[in-house]
Amino acid sequence: MDMIPQLMEGSSAYGGVTNLNIISNNSSSVTGATGGEATQPLSSSSSPSANSSRYENQKRRDWNTFGQYLRNHRPPLSLSRCSGAHVLEFLRYLDQFGKTKVHTNICHFYGHPNPPAPCPCPLRQAWGSLDALIGRLRAAFEENGGKPETNPFGARAVRLYLREVRDMQSKARGVSYEKKKRKRPLPSSSTSSSSAVASHQQFQMLPGTSSTTQLKFEK
């Protein structure tokens, strides 16, 4: 596996795929392939329509760039023949454009979130950028006529790879990608009795729903 990025860097088959917009850290995407928040959110002043438009534009650029990658592949690959293995090949290729320092286990700064001095450790694509990228490409594949069951971006091998990258970078950089659970405030004594009565009168609702929410079956 370690030989693949080196082989691809020196191969003319991939020389044309250098569109760095595909992994922009300023993307508006908030949901990645693993369902986590993979990129920085937009400011609160941004409207939902602007957020959606920015996400759609980024997704379109990602899709076009991946199509270029397939055309530059030797031999050229059609989308119908693209598999999870080709997606992994693509992700490893992108590492040469990374800007995130990932310390090796022999580095003195391994596990240090704020190293006090530079080191020769390699630059890689951040897990959050890769996760968001796969999330966008997975959606674009199905929007362009692909079937969910044949979606190479949702392959088990891709999910496992992203998980390995997340765990490895978390340890190497000394950062945590786990979501912090919000502590719910304890109910006061005046409201505890009324909430107890209400719980017998209606079913427990999911957070963010109301009593008027209707169930919908997904086709």
Swiss-Prot record:
Bias (Polar residues): 200-219
Signal peptide: none
Upper lineage: Eukaryota, Viridiplantae, Streptophyta, Embryophyta, Tracheophyta
Record domain ALOG: where: 54-181
Subcellular location: Nucleus
Cellular component per GO, a single term: nucleus
Gene name of the record: LSH3
Protein name per the record: Protein LIGHT-DEPENDENT SHORT HYPOCOTYLS 3
Record keywords: Developmental protein, DNA-binding, Nucleus, Transcription, Transcription regulation
Family the UniProt entry places it in: Belongs to the plant homeotic and developmental regulators ALOG protein family.
Region entry Disordered, spans: 31-58, 172-219
InterPro entries on file: ALOG, ALOG_dom
Organism: Arabidopsis thaliana (Mouse-ear cress)
